[in-house]
From Swiss-Prot:
It comes from the Bacteria. NCBIfam families: PRK00228.2-1. This is UPF0301 protein NFA_55110. It comes from Nocardia farcinica (strain IFM 10152). PANTHER family: UNCHARACTERIZED PROTEIN YQGE (PTHR30327), UPF0301 PROTEIN YQGE (PTHR30327:SF1). GO terms for cellular component: cytosol. Residues 1-24 are annotated as: Disordered. Belongs to the UPF0301 (AlgH) family.
Amino acid sequence: MARADDPDERKTQGGHGDRRRREFRGGEQVVRAGTLLLAATDLTEPTFRRSVVYIMEHNDSGSLGVVINRPSETSLADVLPRWSALAADPGTLYFGGPVKRDAALCLGTLKVGASTAGVPGLRRIDGRVVLVDLAADPERIAPLVEGIRVFAGYAGWTFGQLEGELDNEDWIVLSALPTDPISAARPDLWADVLRRQPLPMSLLATHPIEVERN
């Protein structure tokens, strides 16, 4: 599962060097930056149960992502007031994963047609989704984004670890929409993502939240 050791501290807000991008295929599954990992129905570990993970990085050093459906009760205005005006509803800090929960990562969704050229503090992950440097000037970024989401901590896998979990069918790999990282806190984003898939995958959305109650 997502690792808690962090030898290189995964400085996601800064530079990454020239790491070779790679993909893993397991059947029809493809993991790359910009895809979603949905917890399989039998993955019951509390940290990742019914979680939706947005993959930010996937290469020879391992994989890194943030859980995008775990809102906290902490208002972003209380911890990062400079960025609160850009925060998508509900405007709270999200729990991004079990690794380095004292560190913050920020994702944003660019407006259609917006360009990041010449704008410091934005790094494109995939399509309209960008990594936002929280040390940047929010006033320069505000005109370019539909919204941002700030995550405390992240989920990380060492090289080969995620592949093993995919072989074990712990995760479902799906395409992401540009707005997924900033989507409003709905009752069950996990089920919402599954409902938009073709049959028979969409049937998994009917899996009950509490199996033992049925």
